């Protein structure tokens, strides 16, 4: 078999990482490269027992630090070859025509699409004599932006995938790579397969893995002709034929088969039935191109349902609602009743009241509607009954309104004015309520004084003082002493690193909960 190469950027100079410790300045990279390009091992997920090859070159390009490595472990390649032969998805081949079918390369690209550089911490002064670069790893996703691993059989093919690399830089990489492979010790790959399976399981549950890979692919300017499936939509319709064998259902995919559902152009549709017919025809045409195939989301038999994409469905819904005629409410024959009059039902006494009124004023009572009685809106009670305000109820006049000097809460004059406001108020209920509040406050202060005096008396009589240790939160220095920072920094994204980044947020939330609990306890003690 031919050689398997892997290439990609270990860091991008123009992008800032999410964590400050992951920053890798260009001057630092150039300084370390001038000191001597030491051969670095290539492993899996920073596991030194899972070394699969060697790094053949590190190059300082305009876009970032580029790496070219070779996979030399035959034991590891045998595992990849067996996995690729049993995978139905890989056996179906790539949907992109320019890519040649290569199950091993596709399996490597799907399992380890990220690159990670293990380097020395910049702030650590204890590792001055040791090399800055430690090793390079292939992983599920890298922590630094733009760290995508491209696997291939030739270095030139890998370099052509990156549009951000110029032609002169490609020649520089091809001339600087050490293509002469040296002997590889197979004992370097001694990792347990269960450990690799556990790492793969942990990586699959990283929530931001696929969005991170999509962003990295855009930062590196990778073309669509790659085996990495990070840029493909997360939900894909796989056309397969189901063959039932016993209690198991075997799905056999057909290479090159695709289910293309086209969305109808709603802008040229002038009727609801035309839109539905066009969408139905599009679906029928797409199904005719797939002989002897049954999609996973096929419609049940004897059904009149039409399966449409979400965008087409909402477009049809908008067209349907937009073409409905606007309903105008009918105009009332009678004019609306104003708020000044209240219409009462007809009663027999209405005629008698009209007759009495006409006899009283010696004139006939003329009514516009003799069968209806109108009553005016009740007026304000004070005006209706001739109510007069008492002399004691006057407009409040405070001495502070006429004074030019300002006072603020806490000043003696301010408290006097507030008391004067309360004295001028003649509401007995308000005064009684304030007196009760003051009396309760005085009683509570008296109880607190009694408790303090009792505690002082007990402490004075006790010959020995017992000290109870209290649990306190560790300081930043104590945290640093208890958990020292690692001297080697691994730039692969794992669930452990994600939880570590969230630890600071959890500590601040715990402190906030503690303060809230103390405040609630104090309020409960005052209420009791």
From Swiss-Prot:
Keyword Thylakoid applies: no
SUPFAM superfamilies: Herpes virus serine proteinase, assemblin
Chain segments carrying region Interaction with pAP: 270-288
EC code: 3.4.21.97
GO molecular function: identical protein binding; serine-type endopeptidase activity
Entry comment, domain topic: Region of interaction between pPR and pAP is called Amino conserved domain (ACD). The region of interaction with major capsid protein is called carboxyl conserved domain (CCD).
UniProt gene name: U53
Enzyme class: hydrolase
GO cellular component terms, A-Z: host cell cytoplasm; host cell nucleus
GO BP term, pick one: nuclear capsid assembly
Active site: 46 (charge relay system), 116 (charge relay system), 135 (charge relay system)
Motif (Nuclear localization signal): 416-422
Family named by the database record: Belongs to the herpesviridae capsid scaffolding protein family.
Residues under site feature: Cleavage: 230-231, 491-492
Name of one Pfam family that matches: Peptidase_S21
Region: Disordered, residue numbers: 394-432
Name of the molecule in the record: Capsid scaffolding protein
Keywords for this protein: Host cytoplasm, Host nucleus, Hydrolase, Phosphoprotein, Protease, Serine protease, Viral capsid assembly, Viral release from host cell
Annotated spans, Interaction with major capsid protein: 508-528
